[in-house]
């Protein structure tokens, strides 16, 4: 596999002028994370219509934006209304453009947009408060955030990874991998390894590493359990 890709770092945006009632706090002050907990409800009600709802089979993957939305000092002050608004907007934008998106990827992306190369635990926790709880789904295949109008049970599409872009398999929702497996087996495949390799090709990956094989094994097992893949001897065929 190719090395993990890191988003191109862009200089952090210059901090905007602060309202008269938002005087700077000392940098050493603790972050009042609890004050942003109610925002999750607001973010849920304001989640816009997601383009993923119309995604079909083999649509090209589009990553969430990485352009700056604020400065480092601002992310350390989530009690400011202007900062809360920008965090909420960045979270919503990522879900709309890239959803389903891995929760940890979503959080890291928003932290990076405030100028940080590394997403420290305390800053991840701040951003986490803004992710709508009802859009998060966690199972044995990972924790992902879904657009509000995309039914993960009914969705049959998947996104192909553009050449040269590294998209780790563990950052792809299990439902999306299963959809790709089903598509790869539409005309039948002669064995399990061929099914895995054909599916990896959709995500611009050629090496079947142990990590990739383990994740694909879980997805194949689940696809069989859901009746989406049918075993024929040592091979597989799509049930749809």
PLM region spans:
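C-terminal interaction surface of TIR/SEFIR-family domains
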Residues: 1-9
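Intrinsically disordered, low-complexity, repeat-rich polar/charged segments
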Residues: 9, 13-15
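C-terminal non-catalytic scaffold/interaction domains in large multidomain proteins
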Residues: 18-240
């Amino acid at each position: 596999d190719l090395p993990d890709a890191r988003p191109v770092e862009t200089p952090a945006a210059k901090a905007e002028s602060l309202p008269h009632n938002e005087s700077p706090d000392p940098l050493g002050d603790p972050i009042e994370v609890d004050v942003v907990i109610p925002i999750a409800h607001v973010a849920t009600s304001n989640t816009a219509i997601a383009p993923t709802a119309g995604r079909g089979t083999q649509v090209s993957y589009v990553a969430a934006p990485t352009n700056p939305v604020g400065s480092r000092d601002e992310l350390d002050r989530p009690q400011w209304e202007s900062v809360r608004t920008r965090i909420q907007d960045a979270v919503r934008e990522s879900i709309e453009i890239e959803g389903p998106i891995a929760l940890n990827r979503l959080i890291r992306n928003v932290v990076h947009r405030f100028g940080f190369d590394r997403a420290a635990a305390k800053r991840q926790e701040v951003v986490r408060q803004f992710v709508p709880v009802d859009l998060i789904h966690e199972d044995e295949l990972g924790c992902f955030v879904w657009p509000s109008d995309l039914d993960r049970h009914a969705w049959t599409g998947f996104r192909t990874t553009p050449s040269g872009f590294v998209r780790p398999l563990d950052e792809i929702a299990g439902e999306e991998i299963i959809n790709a497996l089903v598509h790869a087996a539409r005309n039948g495949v002669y064995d399990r390894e061929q099914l895995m390799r054909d599916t990896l090709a959709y995500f611009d990956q050629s090496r079947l590493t142990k990590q990739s094989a383990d994740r694909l094994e879980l997805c194949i097992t689940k696809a069989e359990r859901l009746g989406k893949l049918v075993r024929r001897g040592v091979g597989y065929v799509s049930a749809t």
